[in-house]
Amino acid sequence: QTEHKEDMLRCAERWRELLLEAGCQRTEIMPSNGNPFVYAEYKCGLDDSPTVLVYSHYDVMPVEPLELWHSNPWEPSIRDGRLYARGADDDKGQAMIQVKAFEYLVHEGLMKCNVKFIFEGEEEIGSPSLESFITDHRDLLKADIILVSDTSMIGKETPSITTGLRGLAYWQIEVTGPNRD
């Protein structure tokens, strides 16, 4: 949404700062046809090390209708031991866990692979800029494995590991029939 363009830029910049603080040697905001991408990379310095590409997104669903919120959606709150905030479950919470795990491994000297991060700002509207961004930056995004945390869980009490994704599929079905019974 164009009305939130500045908010999206601030959010992207904050993620860039967090990735730099976590230990990435290169971080940048990269323009696209829509909201910018956040790119960061860490090179471990070991020859022939594999590269992990971490994908996430920083956009969130619209806050409306406000009356359905039990607390201010713009301020995080904890109720019954759970965190409630915009994007806490899709996908900022998962992204923060990945960044903090990366930060720990780097600062403890345990990171033995190269890591690249790519965070987009349009996942909630179907990622219209993602395909062209990947095409334009194919070499930059090259990796041995991709880590995505924006997946489903079997249930609220059952953590899950998704081992493969195949993309999005859209259908439009038109049904016609007789004009009378």
Tell me what each language-model feature is.
Residues 162-176:
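Flexible glycine/proline-rich, aromatic-decorated loop/lid segments
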Residues 1-66:
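N-terminal helical capping/dimerization or prosegment-like subdomains
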Residues 89-164:
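Acidic/histidine-rich catalytic neighborhood of metal-dependent amide-processing enzymes
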Residues 51-53, 83, 144-148, 170-172:
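Short glycine-aspartate micro-motif
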Residues 39, 116, 170-174:
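Beta-strand secondary-structure signal
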Residues 34-38, 71-73, 170:
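Short glycine-rich loop/turn motifs
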Residues 49-119:
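Active-site metal-coordination/substrate-binding segment of hydrolases
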